[in-house]
Design a protein with these regions (language model features):
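Acidic/His-rich, divalent-metal-binding segments that scaffold phosphate/diphosphate chemistry
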Residues: 1-62
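Conserved active-site and cofactor/substrate-binding residues in soluble primary-metabolism enzymes
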Residues: 3, 7, 23-27, 65, ...
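Predominant activation on well-ordered alpha-helical scaffold segments within soluble catalytic domains
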Residues: 9, 13, 29, 33, ...
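Generic detector of leucine side chains in alpha-helical contexts
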Residues: 11-12, 21, 26, 51, ...
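C-terminal binding/interaction regions
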Residues: 16, 116, 127-128, 133-189
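Divalent metal-dependent catalytic cores for phosphoryl transfer on phosphate-bearing substrates
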Residues: 39-143, 155
Length: 190
């Protein structure tokens, strides 16, 4: 089975009803696709991993079940091991060392997309087009802001990719800007 975006979206929406979790999957997908283009990798595969990485979270929101349940579902449905491993690698508590660029990238963009979303939503415009890397860095210093986001994962992710943190943040912002409307971050909610 070589899953495509349509199959990945079907899986995501089968298990996920929360609009914010679906948008998170879309944001991670956009960042993964952008990095796949940058690294001349398989954009479809990387995008699929980004889109489904949290597909089981709504039904399994605890660290002892999330990802483990998802991996089992993917195996039962015959999904390829590289995609399964990519999904599993994003959860640092599973103690899976990212073994390739795709796995390093999912780890690097997962928390960051959520943080960028939070930064956009507190802006008066609620528009990701108005978010700059400098404003994200400033908010990262405020531990009370989006406290559930692991800032260590964000900085470690950039290091694992061998990318300057500001460049990484800017790159992911640009990827998200490309689908701002789908993410509800185009200012229409302001």
């Amino acid at each position: 089975m070589q899953p495509n975006r349509e199959q990945a979206m079907e899986l995501l929406t089968e298990f996920t009803k929360s609009d914010s979790l679906i948008k998170h999957g879309l944001a991670v997908e956009a960042a993964m696709r952008a990095y796949a283009r940058k690294y001349d990798e398989d954009e479809e595969r990387w995008g699929v991993v980004g889109l489904i990485h949290d597909f089981d979270y709504e039904q399994n929101p605890t660290w002892d079940k999330h990802v483990y349940a998802g991996v089992e579902i993917l195996r039962q449905r015959g999904w390829p091991e590289d995609i399964i491993h990519g999904v599993a690698a994003h959860a640092s508590y599973m103690n899976i060392n990212p073994k390739n660029q795709m796995e390093k990238t999912i780890c690097a963009v997962d928390e960051l997309t959520g943080f960028i979303t939070a930064v956009a939503l507190v802006r008066p415009s609620k528009n990701v087009l108005d978010v700059a890397a400098s404003s994200v860095r400033k908010k990262m210093k405020d531990k009370a802001f989006a406290r559930a986001v692991n800032r260590g994962d964000i900085t470690q992710g950039a290091e694992e990719l061998g990318v300057d943190l500001n460049e990484h943040i800017d790159f992911v912002i640009k990827a998200m800007q490309g689908i701002a409307g789908e993410l509800g971050l185009d200012g229409s909610a302001a």
